[in-house]
């Protein structure tokens, strides 16, 4: 290559040196390499701090040690590459400086052109040989320009070669991050498989023991005597005992009083004619209010609050008092009891409950004794005790 520079005239060498891009791209490349070196140094420092946290921080264990061992080569590689990038920046700047020196040593193309123009003029005017010394001096100057350009090119070539020889090729990273992630994923999958293999027998054993436990409970229940099961109905018996007692007393009283009188029998007689059922006759010759009425699903009132019918105090007492109004002066209860005992052979009179089916035609207005004779009941001050529900 030196021979090439030596054989090229100054017009070509000077034109090549001054016609290029100059040293600007080399200086830009040097700045870029410096920035890359700074980024690589920062990455290496960050990696090193992360590894230090893995090995000396609170999260220390086999996994952290494995990750630190896998990532440690990256720290060395980043440090090496950062140093190489910094060296490349230095060498690029040195190459730019060498080019500038070679450019300064190269003859400007205008000087070469002027020499050639001067030589041509001298040759054209050299009729009698008078311009021979001037032509020789001009040729000597041209040869000096040639030598100067060759020397500049040789020096630039030597400097660029030394700069390039100092640069070392960049090494590849030891392992890719994707490969490291795949290795970690494989290790995690292996740990999950091991844990599943350890837990599965325990779960299967627990599920296998469930039928045995259920069979034992079934056998225990089957061995219990039936009399223990009857104890479950004891609260129901206690609650229904008062109702059963009252029903027995009412049935016994009805048996002692005998068959009902004609008036009560007539009350149970059907009304085939479809005639209107007359109103109740009064006790003692007066009417028993404005007739009987019934309602379904109507709540009672205590003040302004609606309450169930079985609440104590919810049954209006005014119904009985209004229905029994006008019966006269209430009799003496003692005398009434003695009279009932004399008429019934010493048995106290029991008021029979009114039948729902016979609460219509033919019902007498007074009470009947066992012989069918009517009792004349003098008005008494009645007190109605509301019925409370069981439970």
Curated annotation (Swiss-Prot):
GO biological process, one term: response to host immune response
Top-level taxon: Bacteria
InterPro entries linked: PPE_C, PPE_dom, PPE_sf
Any Pfam family matching the protein: PPE-SVP
Gene3D superfamilies, A to Z: PPE superfamily (1.20.1260.20)
Family in the record: Belongs to the mycobacterial PPE family.
The protein's name in its UniProt record: Uncharacterized PPE family protein PPE49
The species this protein was found in: Mycobacterium tuberculosis (strain CDC 1551 / Oshkosh)
Gene: PPE49
